[in-house]
Amino acid sequence: MLSDTIDTKQQQQQLHVLFIDSYDSFTYNVVRLIEQQTDISPGVNAVHVTTVHSDTFQSMDQLLPLLPLFDAIVVGPGPGNPNNGAQDMGIISELFENANGKLDEVPILGICLGFQAMCLAQGADVSELNTIKHGQVYEMHLNDAARACGLFSGYPDTFKSTRYHSLHVNAEGIDTLLPLCTTEDENGILLMSAQTKNKPWFGVQYHPESCCSELGGLLVSNFLKLSFINNVKTGRWEKKKLNGEFSDILSRLDRTIDRDPIYKVKEKYPKGEDTTYVKQFEVSEDPKLTFEICNIIREEKFVMSSSVISENTGEWSIIALPNSASQVFTHYGAMKKTTVHYWQDSEISYTLLKKCLDGQDSDLPGSLEVIHEDKSQFWITLGKFMENKIIDNHREIPFIGGLVGILGYEIGQYIACGRCNDDENSLVPDAKLVFINNSIVINHKQGKLYCISLDNTFPVALEQSLRDSFVRKKNIKQSLSWPKYLPEEIDFIITMPDKLDYAKAFKKCQDYMHKGDSYEMCLTTQTKVVPSAVIEPWRIFQTLVQRNPAPFSSFFEFKDIIPRQDETPPVLCFLSTSPERFLKWDADTCELRPIKGTVKKGPQMNLAKATRILKTPKEFGENLMILDLIRNDLYELVPDVRVEEFMSVQEYATVYQLVSVVKAHGLTSASKKTRYSGIDVLKHSLPPGSMTGAPKKITVQLLQDKIESKLNKHVNGGARGVYSGVTGYWSVNSNGDWSVNIRCMYSYNGGTSWQLGAGGAITVLSTLDGELEEMYNKLESNLQIFM
C-alpha cells in the first residue's frame, strides 16, 4: 500500500508507478484507483504507487536517475495554469519537454492538469473556457483512433464522466497529438483525451477517479497494460533494477509525504475492568432527558447532546464531568506552544500562565507544563498521552471517557495560525481538549443511561440524584422548562459583514476559479454580537437549543483556571447546534457525513420542492466536489472507502440540506504494516472539506491570505478561529465522534462578546444574490436569539 515497505520478491510481481501530485484534493482517489488494478498480465497482478509532489524534485536531473525504477508515470490533476510553467506545476512542465528525448519510451498518463501540460508541450493552446465546468457530469464520445490505440479498449462509444476544469485544450493543427475523445456543451466540441504520437503518452481532461465517472478503473487498467506491453517491447521491463539498493530508494521516496501514525496502534489492548465503572439504568427515550439531567448537575460540565434523533445521528448524548484529575491540553498556534495542566489547579493563575507562555517566568507553577511545539507536533503530544490509556472495553458505548473539546479551523493543514481575537493581550487557543474520567452517557433510542468512571470516582450523590429523578420514569415533562428567549432587559450591538465587502470577496472567488486555481471556495463571514450585560453562556445555550434543535448540539465553557480576585481569564465558550457530523470512528471504521446545499424552510417550501432545488447542477456539483475531496482524505490512509449514501435530502429545524455518507473500512487491517486509528484520519482530514473547497491547499491559502482577511476585518482579521473547526471526543475505547463547528457561536472572553460564523460554497454556477441569501439563512438560525 501507500506507505508499506517493499519486499524485493514482491516487486518482481508488481508494476511500479510514479504518481506526481500537484497538491490536489483528488490525488488519492487516483492513486487507489491505480492500486486496485490487478489483472495486468500473467505474473503481474499488483501495482505499487509511489507518490511525490510536483516540487519534490527541483529538476529533471534529480528524477532521471530514478526512472528505471518505474514502469509508468501518472501526472495527476491540480490547480493552476500550465502556461505558468514551474510556478504552478513544478517539475511537470520539464517532464513533458522530454528531457532531450530521455522519456520517449516511458509510459505517461496525464489527468486534467497533466493532460493540459502534455498537450501544451506539443504546441497546443490551453485557454480559459467561456463556461467553466466544475463537478458536472457529461457524456464523452470516442473516435476510431481511441478504439485503435488501446486506452479505451472495452469501452462503449459513449460514457459519462465528471469534469473539473476551468481551462481547455485546443489541439487543432497540432500534428503530434492524436485526438481520442471529445464532449460537447455550450463551449462547443471540446477535446477530452489525446495521445502524443509515436510516444506512450496519453491524457484525459476529465476525472476518471470521480465517484460519478463511469469506467474509470478500466481506463487505468488499460493504461497499465499498455505500459507493460511497451516496456517489454522496449526492454525497459528487463532493465528495471530491483536490487536492495533500489528497494531502499523506493521506500525513501514513499516516505517523502508524511503518513506516519500519530501513535503506534496495538493489535490487543487491556480490558481495564479493574478500574472502569459502568452502571446502566433504564430511562425515558425522550431527547429532552439530557437537558433535564443538566438541570440537576451542579458540577462543571461539557454537553454533547441531540435534540433531533434520526438513524445513525443524534442517538446518543454525552455529559462530560471534568474534575481535579482531568488534564487540560491547550495549543496556541501563533506561539507554537502547548500547555498541559490539571483542571482548576489552585497553584495556577491566568497571570502566571501568561508569564510562562511569554517566557517571562521559567518557574512553572503546580502541574503546568509548557511544551514548545507546532500544531503538527501537538497531535503527537495527544497520541503519547492517549496510547497507554486505550482499553478494549464497552465498545458498544460511544464514549466511556477520554479527550473532549474543540479543534479550531487553524489547527488544520495548510493554514497559518494567527491571533483570533480583538484583544492583543489575551491568549487565544487554537485547540483545547480535556481528559474526562467521569461521564453520563444516554442512548435515546433504547432508553438507557450510563454512569461511567475510568477511575471509580463517579460522584455518589449525583448518581443517586439520577436514580431518584429519572430511572424507570418513561415520561418526562412534555415541554422543557428552559426559556425560549433571552432576558428582555439585555440589548445587543450586532456587527454584520458588509454587503459590499462580501460582493468583492465573491468576485475574487470567481476570478480564482476562472483562472483554474480552485474548483470551489467556501467563503465564510463573521458576525459580532456585544450584549449590554454579560449573560451566562449556559443561559444562552438553553435558549439556543430550544430555538434551533439539531443532532449535534454542544456546550463547552472552559473554566479550567480559577480566576484570582484581580483577574478576568479569557474563558473560551462554545455553543453549537450543528447539523453536520464531520467524522465518526470506531476501532476499524470511520464515517464522514458532508453537508452541502441549503434551502430555507418556509410556508411555501416543502421536502419535494427542496429536493428539486437541491438536485440542480449547482447544488449537485457543490456536493460532488466535497464528496470526491472527502474520499481523497480517507484514501490517503485507508484502502477501502465506500460512498454509502449519495446526496440525500434531509430536513432540519430551519433548513433542508443535501447530505452524503462516506465510510472507510480497515483502519487496523492485519494485512497492512501500518495500523492507523481514527485520530490519524482526523488529523489528515482537517480542516473539514465542506468548509474549505477544493483543491484544499491552495483554496484555504487564498481564502485566508487574499479574501477573508479583508471581508472579516471587523472581527478577527481574517482568522476563523473556533468556527469551521470541529468539536467532539476521542474515547479510550477507540471510538470518536466530531461535528463541524457551524450554526454555532463562540466567545474568547467569557461572554463579553460573541462571534457567529456563516458561509457557503462558491462555485462558478453561484450567484451573488443566491450566496448572500444562503449565508444569511445559515446565520439567522443562531443569530435569531439576539434579535
Curated annotation (Swiss-Prot):
GO biological process: 4-aminobenzoate biosynthetic process; folic acid biosynthetic process; tetrahydrofolate biosynthetic process
Pathway membership: Cofactor biosynthesis; tetrahydrofolate biosynthesis; 4-aminobenzoate from chorismate: step 1/2
Catalysed reaction, written as an equation: chorismate + L-glutamine = 4-amino-4-deoxychorismate + L-glutamate
Active-site residues per Swiss-Prot or TrEMBL entry: 112, 207, 209
Subcellular location: Cytoplasm
The EC number(s) this enzyme carries: 2.6.1.85
Residues covered by the Glutamine amidotransferase type-1 domain: 16-233
CDD domains to which the protein is assigned, alphabetical: GATase1_Anthranilate_Synthase (cd01743)
SUPFAM superfamilies: ADC synthase, Class I glutamine amidotransferase-like
TM regions (residue ranges): none
InterPro entries, sorted: ADC_synthase, Anth_synth_I-like, Anth_synth_I_N, Chorismate_C, Class_I_gatase-like, GATASE, PabB_fungal, TrpG/PapA_dom
A cellular-component GO term for this protein: cytoplasm
GO molecular function, one term: 4-amino-4-deoxychorismate synthase activity
Record keywords, A-Z: Cytoplasm, Folate biosynthesis, Glutamine amidotransferase, Multifunctional enzyme, Transferase
Pfam families: Anth_synt_I_N, Chorismate_bind, GATase
Note: Present with 1550 molecules/cell in log phase SD medium.
PANTHER family, alphabetized: AMINOBENZOATE/ANTHRANILATE SYNTHASE, AMINODEOXYCHORISMATE SYNTHASE
Annotated function: Catalyzes the biosynthesis of 4-amino-4-deoxychorismate (ADC) from chorismate and glutamine. Required for the synthesis of 4-aminobenzoate (PABA), an important component in tetrahydrofolate biosynthesis.
Free-text note regarding domains: The PABA component provides the glutamine amidotransferase activity. The PABB component catalyzes the formation of ADC by binding chorismate and ammonia.
Protein name: Aminodeoxychorismate synthase
Lineage of producing organism: Eukaryota, Fungi, Dikarya, Ascomycota, Saccharomycotina
Gene that encodes the chain: ABZ1
